[in-house]
């Protein structure tokens, strides 16, 4: 199986989750507690960047997240062509 195929399989596994609880249980099995903490932090940073007009330093002080993490999330939110974060925010706006 090629590396790309493994990524598709993981994405399909997430699509098979029928509820928020299914996703949480899958993540608990798939990730270490530290990885889950990192994912939650990134998502919180992303929401803060998207909805609030705060500097990186203000976000760091508010959330206790490293400036490196904030910068990485901001780059993917604003500059990267994956549009993963933007796609989710667009879908949230539709509901």
Task: Label every model-predicted segment.
Residues 1-15:
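General nucleic-acid-binding
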Residues 57-64, 70:
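Short alpha-helical "recognition helix" segments of helix-turn-helix
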Residues 87-95:
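Intrinsically disordered, low-complexity basic tails/linkers immediately adjacent to helix-turn-helix/homeobox/MYB/SANT
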Residues 23-42:
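Short, Lys/Arg-enriched anionic-surface-contact patches
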Residues 75-87:
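Short, solvent-exposed alpha-helical "recognition" segments
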Residues 46, 71-78:
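Recognition helix of helix-turn-helix/homeodomain-like DNA-binding domains
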Residues 39-54:
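Short, amphipathic alpha-helical "recognition" segments used to contact nucleic acids or chromatin
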């Amino acid at each position: 199986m090629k590396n790309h195929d493994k990524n598709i399989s993981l994405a399909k596994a997430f699509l098979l989750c029928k509820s928020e609880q299914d996703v949480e249980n899958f993540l608990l099995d798939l990730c270490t507690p530290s990885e889950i903490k990192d994912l939650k932090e990134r998502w919180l940073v992303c929401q803060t960047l998207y909805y609030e007009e705060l500097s990186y330093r203000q976000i760091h002080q508010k959330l206790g997240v490293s400036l490196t993490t904030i910068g990485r999330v901001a780059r993917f939110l604003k500059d990267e062509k994956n549009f993963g974060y933007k796609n989710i925010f667009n879908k949230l706006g539709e509901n």
